[in-house]
Amino acid sequence: MKEQEIQSSMNKSVEATQRNFNTIRTGRANASLLDRISVEYYGAETPIKSLASISTIDSQTISIQPFDISSLQTIEKAISVSDLGITPNNDGKVIRINVPPLTEERRKEFCKLASKYAEEGKVALRNIRRDAVDKEKKDEKEGLISKDVSRDNQLEIQKFTDKYISLIETKLSEKEKEILKV
């Protein structure tokens, strides 16, 4: 694997971890809370953001305005049955979601969830490292590169891995602070 490929793959893993973090409630209204919720629409699972305009009115309220009014009920139902613990209010045209402040217990649950997402991201990085190191060893075995070059490349791969793992840990600590902030 080339250096650029490795960094690109690792960057994608960090971005995926960040997207997972964005779906965790922090007690503040945020449109990305709804990113993981899909709705059955004309026989296909469709993300809410594809069916409606989502905006935050203030720090506690999210507004969802469906492009097609007939999808209002299904969007409301999907939000109700989600694991977000929020209740949508439907006024016939717009769905409003009041995001209540989080309880201490719920904050701790979300911190655990953030840690789980961070660990998944680190595992993905380690898998990328393993694949890259295996390729280096294979190239060395086939005589394509010398033992010294292989070892240098493996050390470089480890440096990338350490860099990106520390980046995930930084993002995790930021997210935990955001969750625990009252």
From Swiss-Prot:
A cellular component term, taken from the record's GO annotations: cytoplasm
Keyword ATP-binding included in the entry's annotation: no
Annotated keywords: Cytoplasm, Protein biosynthesis
Principal localisation: cytoplasm
Listed GO MF terms: ribosomal large subunit binding
Keyword match Cell membrane: no
InterPro entries found in the cross-reference section: Ribosome_recyc_fac (IPR002661), Ribosome_recyc_fac_dom (IPR023584), RRF_sf (IPR036191)
A Gene Ontology BP annotation from the UniProt entry: translational termination
Pfam families according to UniProt: RRF (PF01765)
Subcellular location: Cytoplasm
Recorded superkingdom: Bacteria
Protein family: Belongs to the RRF family.
Reported function: Responsible for the release of ribosomes from messenger RNA at the termination of protein biosynthesis. May increase the efficiency of translation by recycling ribosomes from one round of translation to another.
HAMAP family, sorted: RRF
Entries under PANTHER family matching the protein: MITOCHONDRIAL RIBOSOME RECYCLING FACTOR PSEUDO 1 (PTHR20982:SF3), RIBOSOME RECYCLING FACTOR (PTHR20982)
Protein name per its UniProtKB record: Ribosome-recycling factor
Organism of origin: Prochlorococcus marinus subsp. pastoris (strain CCMP1986 / NIES-2087 / MED4)
Record gene name: frr
